[in-house]
Amino acid sequence: MATPDAGRQGSGRWVVVLPLEPLRAGDVFSVGQWPLHVTLVEPFTTAIDADALGAALEPLAASTAPVPVTIGPDALFGPKHDIPVSLVEDGGRLAPLRADAQDALRALAVDLRHPRTDYRPHVTAKRHGRVREGDRLTLELLTLVRLRPPETSHHGRIAGSWSLSGRAGSAP
């Protein structure tokens, strides 16, 4: 799949998320309009282009079933504990998906620096929307986001988005 960042030279900053709404390659957004999502792999910097990153992530999405989640209680994140989030109850399904995504990126020699060891899936509350405790959602997409792309003033651009369509991890 060709992406808007295909073949672009130099380092790029990226993040891998599970969006709550459909996102397509090429979609852009500002800081204030970040689509609601669960971060799967924290931001990382690499000179590897979007096509190679996507080629590593796409098979993972294809082999992973959609992930049903329930929104749990609210919490405050960040160094000052001033960022409102809603915790995500996932029945333990996101940690292996996260590890597999990290492994796929590391196989390309992507340096993930210091991934969090205390991963707590959550959705950050935004002015334009939020989730509520008790909401039941199904995470159906794995999405690669280019942060602060150099040719635009937007905060992010969707470099690739793949359906979670596999049977892996599905209940018997």
Question: What does each model-identified segment do?
Answer:
Residues 75-85:
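Short, basic/glycine-rich phosphate-binding loops at helix/coil junctions
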Residues 1-70, 76, 90-143, 153-158, ...:
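Basic, often amphipathic N-terminal segments
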Residues 145-147:
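Short, conserved, GDST-rich strand-edge loop motifs in beta-rich repeat architectures
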